[in-house]
Swiss-Prot record:
PANTHER family: 54S RIBOSOMAL PROTEIN L1, MITOCHONDRIAL (PTHR36427), LARGE RIBOSOMAL SUBUNIT PROTEIN UL1M (PTHR36427:SF3). The keyword Heme does not apply. One of its GO terms (molecular function) is tRNA binding. NCBIfam families: rplA_bact. InterPro entries: Ribosom_uL1_bac-type (IPR005878), Ribosomal_uL1 (IPR002143), Ribosomal_uL1-like (IPR023674), Ribosomal_uL1/biogenesis (IPR028364), Ribosomal_uL1_3-a/b-sand (IPR016095), Ribosomal_uL1_CS (IPR023673). This is Large ribosomal subunit protein uL1. It comes from Liberibacter asiaticus (Citrus greening disease). Keywords: Repressor, Ribonucleoprotein, Ribosomal protein, RNA-binding, rRNA-binding, Translation regulation, tRNA-binding. HAMAP family: Ribosomal_uL1_B. Binds directly to 23S rRNA. The L1 stalk is quite mobile in the ribosome, and is involved in E site tRNA release. Belongs to the universal ribosomal protein uL1 family. Part of the 50S ribosomal subunit. One of its GO terms (biological process) is regulation of translation.
């Protein structure tokens, strides 16, 4: 099995110079040419940042709405009551509730990809931190998932909102579309994501902020993108 995977990766990586940097348009073409899996692979981006992840004040976190969506049907849960619950439902939320939703999640039933909460619900939702936190879906004010404007938050989530957060090695990973997208739409999503990460640069970060940008598909190899393709 391992040999089959290795052989496949060798075939996919043919024609790619691992030490070279490619323009964004060329990188997208190469990525799509090598996406040969029998499903619509996700276009993934990895950004190596010049931050010290050991310091909390250099954490990079935010949210960006992909201009062309992500190609994923996102299920949204909203912790809200009364009129805010009605607004969430009307905006298209899949699950809406208060104490009842709390009990469902506490019991381990998490049938959603994104979680939104009104501020008054956070004392309750905060008790679910050990469940929602590790999954990266704990409502957070900084990424707009703790809000009184639940309708807008739901619509943005449904239309392609992507959360990002730097990891221990100072790297950010995210899925930003599907290989079935038109090349231009993938490029636009990449540019939007990179721009959002650049805007989220910590004021205390020193030196070069964006060190490397790499694109890949779910089953593909990494393709390094020339930073001159971006305003970094």
């Amino acid at each position: 099995m391992v040999s089959k995977i290795s052989k496949r990766m060798q075939q996919i990586s043919q024609g790619i110079d691992r030490s070279a940097l490619y323009g964004l348009s060329d990188a997208v073409v190469m990525l799509k040419e090598r996406a040969t899996a029998r499903f619509d692979e996700t276009v993934e981006i990895a950004m190596n940042l010049g931050i010290d992840p050991r310091h909390a004040n250099q954490m990079v976190r935010g949210v960006v709405t992909m201009p062309n969506g992500t190609g994923v049907n996102v299920r949204v849960a909203v912790f809200a009551t009364s009129s805010k619950a009605d607004e969430a439902r009307e905006a298209g939320a899949d699950i809406v509730g208060g104490e009842d939703l709390f009990e469902i999640v506490k019991g381990g039933q998490i049938d959603f990809d994104r979680c939104i909460a009104t501020p008054d619900m956070m004392p309750l939702v905060g008790r679910l931190g050990r469940i929602l936190g590790p999954r990266g879906i704990m409502p957070n004010l900084r990424v707009g998932t703790v809000t009184t404007d639940v309708a807008t938050a739901v619509r943005e989530s449904k239309s392609g909102a992507v959360d990002f957060r730097s990891e221990k090695a100072g790297i950010i990973h995210a899925g930003i579309g599907k290989v079935s997208f038109e090349n231009k739409k993938i490029e636009e999503n990449v540019l939007a994501f990179v721009s959002a990460v650049v805007k989220a640069k910590p004021s205390v970060a020193k030196g070069d902020y964006v060190k490397r940008v790499t694109l890949s598909s779910t089953m593909g190899c990494g393709i390094k993108v020339d930073l001159s393709s971006f305003s970094v």
